[in-house]
Amino acid sequence: MLRIMISSLILAMGLVFCQAGQVDASAPAVSLFGDGIVAETGEGPIWDPVTSRLLWVDIEGHRVLVSDPESGNTEVHEVPAAPGTVVPSKDGEWIVALKDGIYSYREADRTIRKVAVPDDLTDAVRFNDGKCDPRGRFWVGTVDTVRYADPIAALYRLEGSAVTRVLGGVTISNGIAWAPDGTRMYYIDTPTRKVVAYDYNLETGELCKGVDAILIPEGWGDPDGCTIDSEGMLWVALWGGYAVSRWNPETGECLQRISLPVKHVTAMAFGGDDLDTMFITTAKASWAGLDEPDAGKLFVCRPGVKGLKAHLFDPVDKGTP
């Protein structure tokens, strides 16, 4: 009980620091990515360390997007259903979570094949954000697409071709990230307005002892995607909050906010040769009726800290020679 009280006090102190307006000092300049491609709902950015390109998705546009910083151009790959996220695989293909299942996509000939479908997947949900752990397991969650308010979604783990339901009672599964040493997993179910930190068993891929690490203050927007930096600090995109934010997951303290000229900020990823460039995805969200000419575009900045190399999916089934 004492530990809980102390943790709550530290977390509250972190929120006071955020609300005191001390987090926008020396904010880096934010600019648009080269070709200015627009996504209805840009999401799931991840830097492919093999090809030195950024992979991301346009959910409503049914597209996987590949942005090359060298040329400033973006290649478009259409997929048959709404993609929630994409991650590169060790075999050179991409793992793409579509509405109705998890697929492997081959860039060379633009072919797609189904890898796994959870037994409990229904038409009332679709796959959303996801990432791989340091051992190459793919973690991905679903979202309630009927009211975006009911806890009917779940979080899954894909190992090889075997998919396992890990958490239930989820509403809008979003950001997932691991501490640099892989012993903690950070997870966001957006309506809860918090980041939960789980002790993580790297050998088995099991979660235990989840604790509230970060609470997003009212009026800041809702927590969406997240990523970790080389110092172990967690970055959280603020949907409806015009910003991305950097937090200390041990204290709950907000360290920095980077403002953007669009309301619906969805996710961010570190990339570039030195992993010192941040790529930030946004949503056009036409239904919102906002006058934002740059909404849905990809933004870039140099936040002053480096990221970590992305974990690739391991397609080999456990126990397979």
Locate predicted features.
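Asp-box/WD-like beta-propeller blade repeats and closely related beta-sheet repeat scaffolds
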Residues: 109-146, 162
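Conserved beta-strand positions in repeat-built beta-propeller and related beta-rich domains
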Residues: 47-49, 54-59, 95-100, 138-146, ...
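Bacterial N-terminal signal peptides
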Residues: 5-17
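Beta-rich, blade/repeat-based domains predominating
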Residues: 36-51, 80-97, 121-137, 166-184, ...
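A short loop-to-beta-strand structural motif that recurs across blades of beta-propeller domains
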Residues: 63-65, 101-103, 153-156, 194-196, ...
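Blade-level signature of beta-propeller repeat domains, shared across WD40, Kelch, NHL, RCC1
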Residues: 271-321
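Short loop/turn segments immediately following beta-strands, especially the blade-tip
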Residues: 198-205, 303-308
